[in-house]
Amino acid sequence: MTSTPHHPDLRSQLETLTTEAFRPELAEIDQLPTLDIARLMNGEDATVPAAVAERLPEIAAAIDAVAVRMARGGRLIYAGAGTAGRLGVLDASECPPTFNTGPGQVVGLIAGGPDAMVTSIEGAEDSPELARADLDALALTADDTVVGVSASGRTPYAVGAVEYARSLGALTVGLACNRDSALAAAAEHGIEVVTGPELLTGSTRLKAGTAQKLVLNMLSTITMIRLGKTYGNLMVDVRASNEKLRARSRRIVALATGAADDDIERALTATDGEVKDAILVLLADVDGPTAARLLAESGGHLRAAMAAALG
């Protein structure tokens, strides 16, 4: 299990990380006009997608592996500290309304627990034991996936989570923003998006955080596409929990079917508001219970259910 390094050792570690590098050409950035600083920052941010693009093969391989586990009932679990942990919690929290996932299907763990979302929890990121306890509380199984997220790639909480998860047979992914990181080495799927030195020295909530957000977007979104949570580029598993989402549900059914508003309302009523079921009712001319059965038999994949209904 990873141990917390002493301060001199940690300082020497940080000096080797590109995300911590000092940029002398920016030493007087505080003397520049605001617009010039904004242009500099925007230019820095524009380099991030290219850094992510270099790692697309590794990202795609991880997604395919995650989808296999989740299709067997496994969970997607993010583990990180500070900004990295908050980004994992954010991505996990968006999955239920977007893809109608169960509350425990995509989970974000942040070192120090929920309070760490808004305040710093002293020493939490330095504890691999805390990561192990957090995973034990979830009753981790071999069908689950743990994604450790850390800009430095050395955060003990993230590395510890991946090491422990892998020891239990779970799938592991390590997302870091430095080369040759301990986190990527500990994981079955290492993804190192090298974003380089930050505009503000060591402030990895900037380019590194942006890169992490882009990769987490891909991990969750494309995994859900693989699991049949979309129909084309339509969010057919959206959970209509408010008026905006109810309106979006009607629009999705309209885009998928071209049906009249009255027919859409009848189909949504017949399927208790389930968008995917309503589309099947309209396109395959089946009733609500039949649509639900066909989708269940097709593992939730609308195209497969449609083929079964029409074939």
UniProtKB/Swiss-Prot annotation:
Top-level class of the enzyme under EC nomenclature: lyase
Enzyme Commission number(s): 4.2.1.126
Catalytic activity: N-acetyl-D-muramate 6-phosphate + H2O = N-acetyl-D-glucosamine 6-phosphate + (R)-lactate
Alphabetical GO biological process terms: amino sugar catabolic process; N-acetylmuramic acid catabolic process; peptidoglycan turnover
Keyword Lyase: yes
Active site: 94 (proton donor), 125
SUPFAM superfamilies per record: SIS domain (SSF53697)
Domain of life: Bacteria
Pathway: Amino-sugar metabolism; N-acetylmuramate degradation
Keywords, alphabetical: Carbohydrate metabolism, Lyase
Span of domain SIS: 66-229
One Pfam family in the UniProt entry: GKRP_SIS_N
Example GO molecular function: carbohydrate derivative binding
PANTHER family: GLUCOKINASE REGULATORY PROTEIN
Chain's role: Specifically catalyzes the cleavage of the D-lactyl ether substituent of MurNAc 6-phosphate, producing GlcNAc 6-phosphate and D-lactate.
Note: A lyase-type mechanism (elimination/hydration) is suggested for the cleavage of the lactyl ether bond of MurNAc 6-phosphate, with the formation of an alpha,beta-unsaturated aldehyde intermediate with (E)-stereochemistry, followed by the syn addition of water to give product.
Family, as annotated: Belongs to the GCKR-like family. MurNAc-6-P etherase subfamily.
Quaternary context: Homodimer.
Record protein name field: N-acetylmuramic acid 6-phosphate etherase
Organism of provenance: Streptomyces coelicolor (strain ATCC BAA-471 / A3(2) / M145)
Gene name linked to the record: murQ
